[in-house]
Amino acid sequence: MQKATYCDGSAIYSGLPYQSANGLGYDASQQQYLQALHAESEYHRPACSLQSPGISAGLHTSNEMSEVCQQINGTQATVTDTSDNKQPPTAPSGPSSPSSLNQIPNIDSAAKNPVHVSPTPSTRKHIFPWMKESRQNTKQKSCSIISVESCAGDKSPPGSAASKRARTAYTSAQLVELEKEFHFNRYLCRPRRVEMANLLNLTERQIKIWFQNRRMKYKKDQKGLGMMPSPGAQSPHSPVSLSSGGGGGGGSAYLSSMHSLVNSVTYDSPSPASYNKPQSNTYSLPTSYPPLNNCPPPQKRYQGTGTATPEYDTHHIQGNNNYGTQVQGSPVYVSGGGGYSDSLVGMGASVFGLTHLPHPSQGNIDYNGAITMGNSHQQGACDSNPCTFTDLTPHYSQGRIQEAPKLTHL
């Protein structure tokens, strides 16, 4: 770093005027001019830097030359180029006077001897004030950054030493308010979180983290108790409740009974029986139904295939006793006939909602194809005439209805 390390040759050879090769010479009277220039510009490069290598080769180092200049003059002498006409003096390229050449070794020896030189104000000026300020500013900035990181422990990066957060200790009042809020709403919106933070003197981040931890604890507790319902579906552990009404049952009972009957029945006839459609006047139905108290209803006669007298078995009628309450009132599908026959064991009218249909529950059953209603069906003064039902279905096969298994998959 060459800052003001050279000094003028006239400062060294102040009492020895000499004539240079180009006609310019130094004299002792030039020191006043140099001092005036030194007062104007102190930090410019000196005129010694313009010397030729002939004289500068005799000097060892610039530091030693600066120390010699400080001993002789005490101040740094600098020469600037004022104009092109006034050229600064340069050292002679040719051989100079013998006296000046003889003093160069003496200068070298004098430069080697004073190694330890007390610092002068000129040497102290090498460290400028702005340099000290910059170093202090950098130290202050680094200290301020460290202090900010240490103070704001929550916002520090995870790798730094100040990243370890202190465990937040909530007071009992804060915990009560947080638990109360969690009881009503497990997820807080931001306006409510800001309100809670202002109310409890906490930060939004602390409240958000508390709610996250509380939700995880709630889920863990629910899983431990086995009470967490699967979303959008019913839990497989909870049983399916079948609502059975008193005597008939509900719609679910009807579905389960029908499902069990369909699965248990075996079909051996590939095609259903063919029915001969009677004429339109075969069915003589009354157009009006008078009330039962006034007059007896007319005799209703259903004529089907006429001479076909199907054979009945009491087997499938007694098999209904093995079914539950839901199955007793359900119609029995008999193979081969392609139709349903009402079971006579239980009254299942409420299962199907067919309360308007007559059920021969108290009638006498004739297994030759006719069901005759007895006198026990009378209400008030009304005498019920026997209704003859000629069945439309052909021969029923024996023992086709088996006991239906209980369903567990519904």
Curated annotation (Swiss-Prot):
Q: What is the lineage of its organism?
A: Eukaryota, Metazoa, Chordata, Craniata, Vertebrata
The entry sums up its family as follows: Belongs to the Antp homeobox family.
Which Pfam family is an annotated match for this chain, by its short name? DUF4074
Q: What biological-process terms (Gene Ontology) are attached? A: anterior/posterior pattern specification; embryonic skeletal system morphogenesis; regulation of transcription by RNA polymerase II
Q: A Gene Ontology CC term for this entry? A: nucleus
Name the predominant localization: nucleus
This chain belongs to which protein, by name?
Answer: Homeobox protein Hox-A3a
Q: Which UniProt keywords apply?
A: Developmental protein, DNA-binding, Homeobox, Nucleus, Transcription, Transcription regulation
Q: Return the InterPro entries for the record.
A: DUF4074, HD, HD_metazoa, Homeobox_Antennapedia_CS, Homeobox_CS, Homeodomain-like_sf
Write out the ranges of the annotated region (Disordered). Answer: 79-126, 222-249
Superkingdom of this entry's organism? Eukaryota
This entry's Gene Ontology molecular function terms read: DNA binding; DNA-binding transcription factor activity, RNA polymerase II-specific; RNA polymerase II cis-regulatory region sequence-specific DNA binding
Q: Which CDD domains match?
A: homeodomain
Q: Where is this motif: Antp-type hexapeptide?
A: 127-132
Could you tell me where this protein is found in the cell?
Nucleus
Q: Which residues bind DNA?
A: 163-222
Q: What does this protein do?
A: Sequence-specific transcription factor which is part of a developmental regulatory system that provides cells with specific positional identities on the anterior-posterior axis.
